[in-house]
């Protein structure tokens, strides 16, 4: 993380840490989540804390918070990269990757794919059965194949 990103995370942490104890407990996390428009249940709050709480203290300290934020920022960056790739396929800007889009990209990359192979690729990623690949389907398949 850059110094600026660390500073942003420190400011966010300090906002959550309402009593200034240097840690975020379940009550503080619930208040902050509600302020952000979420309504997490008590179990969800406990799970969030246990997922982040590496030392088993039952609270989140700044180091643990920073590790979580670093991971989240990494996810955001890879999502942006995947969406850039999606837009390269979706050259007609329909919000979907069609058979025609995929065939064009394969040809540009010098891949000699048959129409059947292209259709198989679409079928593999197409979760809603509309015959095209939307952003979520593309994101999912890219994550699944670990290309990002």
Swiss-Prot record:
GO terms for biological process: cell division. The keyword Metal-binding applies. Ca(2+) 2 binds at residues 53, 55, 57, 59, 64. SMART domains: EFh. Belongs to the centrin family. It comes from the Eukaryota. It comes from Spermatozopsis similis. Residues 4-39, 40-75, 77-112, 113-148 form the EF-hand domain. This is Caltractin. This calcium-binding protein is found in the basal body complexes (the functional homolog of the centrosome in animal cell). In mitotic cells it is specifically associated with the poles of the mitotic spindles at the sites of the duplicated basal body complexes.
């Amino acid at each position: 993380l850059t110094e600026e990103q660390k500073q942003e995370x420190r400011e966010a942490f300090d906002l959550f840490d309402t009593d200034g104890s240097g840690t975020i407990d379940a009550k503080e996390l619930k208040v902050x989540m509600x302020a952000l428009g979420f309504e997490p249940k008590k179990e969800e709050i406990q799970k969030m804390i246990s997922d982040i709480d590496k030392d088993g203290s039952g609270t989140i300290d700044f180091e643990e918070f920073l590790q979580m934020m670093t991971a989240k920022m990494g996810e955001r960056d890879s999502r942006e990269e995947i969406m850039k790739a999606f837009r390269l396929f979706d050259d007609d800007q329909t919000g979907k990757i069609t058979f025609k889009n995929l065939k064009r990209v394969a040809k540009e990359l010098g891949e000699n794919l048959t129409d059947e192979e292209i259709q198989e690729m679409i079928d593999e990623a197409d979760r809603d059965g509309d015959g095209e690949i939307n952003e979520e389907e593309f994101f999912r398949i890219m994550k699944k194949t670990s290309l990002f």
